[in-house]
């Protein structure tokens, strides 16, 4: 079983950044890859997704989400709700172990493994093994510094990588 990842989304003003670490872990004690890319731009670069969980499952869900974005003209919320409904109804999709964070210029959404779509109260959301560490760090930085979203996301992941053994500091950041 592949596990471990940290993904963080940070929104501030008109900017939103999504960052992820690069580590893929197999079992409890084997690092298979240090430089994996877990952040993707979709729908002509207007949407950014970050995924955590089983690698194959996360890629499958990311692909399904991209199809829904195309089907619904880039409407992030509609695509997320439609994906969640399909996720809950489909016997194969229900077994997938993954989480997605999806952002566009207006919205930040968490699409959960139970087929739920959650719009966070805060301008920061984290998922994966180091998600809570990164989220706490990002919230502190977001409200107490003048750093921009890219710097907050990167610094939050650096902090999480010092705490979570399933998170490394090989960080990818995408910004809208």
UniProtKB/Swiss-Prot annotation:
GO terms for cellular component: HslUV protease complex; proteasome core complex. Its EC number is 3.4.25.2. Na(+) binds at residues 161, 164, 167. Allosterically activated by HslU binding. GO terms for molecular function: metal ion binding; threonine-type endopeptidase activity. It catalyses: ATP-dependent cleavage of peptide bonds with broad specificity. It is found in: Cytoplasm. Its main location: cytoplasm. The keyword Cytoplasm applies. SUPFAM superfamilies: N-terminal nucleophile aminohydrolases (Ntn hydrolases) (SSF56235). Keywords: Allosteric enzyme, Cytoplasm, Hydrolase, Metal-binding, Protease, Sodium, Threonine protease. The active site is at residue 5. One of its GO terms (biological process) is proteolysis involved in protein catabolic process. Protease subunit of a proteasome-like degradation complex believed to be a general protein degrading machinery. A double ring-shaped homohexamer of HslV is capped on each side by a ring-shaped HslU homohexamer. The assembly of the HslU/HslV complex is dependent on binding of ATP. Belongs to the peptidase T1B family. HslV subfamily. PANTHER family: ATP-DEPENDENT PROTEASE SUBUNIT HSLV (PTHR32194:SF0), METALLOPROTEASE TLDD (PTHR32194). This is ATP-dependent protease subunit HslV. The lineage of its organism: Bacteria, Bacillati, Bacillota, Clostridia, Thermoanaerobacterales. The gene is hslV.
């Amino acid at each position: 079983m592949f596990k471990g990842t940290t993904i963080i989304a940070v929104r501030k003003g008109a900017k939103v950044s999504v960052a992820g670490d690069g580590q893929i872990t197999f079992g409890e004690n084997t690092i298979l890859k240090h430089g994996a890319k877990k952040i993707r731009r979709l729908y002509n670069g207007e949407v950014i997704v970050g995924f955590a969980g089983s690698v194959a499952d996360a890629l499958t869900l990311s692909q399904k989400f991209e199809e829904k974005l195309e089907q619904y003209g880039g409407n992030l919320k509609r695509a997320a709700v439609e994906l969640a409904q399909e996720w809950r109804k489909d016997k194969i999709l229900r077994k997938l172990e993954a989480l997605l964070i999806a952002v566009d210029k207006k919205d930040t959404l968490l699409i959960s493994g139970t087929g739920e779509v959650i719009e966070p109260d805060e301008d920061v959301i984290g998922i994966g093994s180091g998600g809570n560490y990164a989220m706490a760090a990002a919230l502190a930085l977001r409200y107490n510094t003048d750093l921009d979203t890219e710097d907050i996301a990167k610094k939050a992941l650096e902090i999480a990588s010092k705490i979570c053994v399933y998170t490394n500091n090989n960080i990818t950041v995408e910004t809208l």
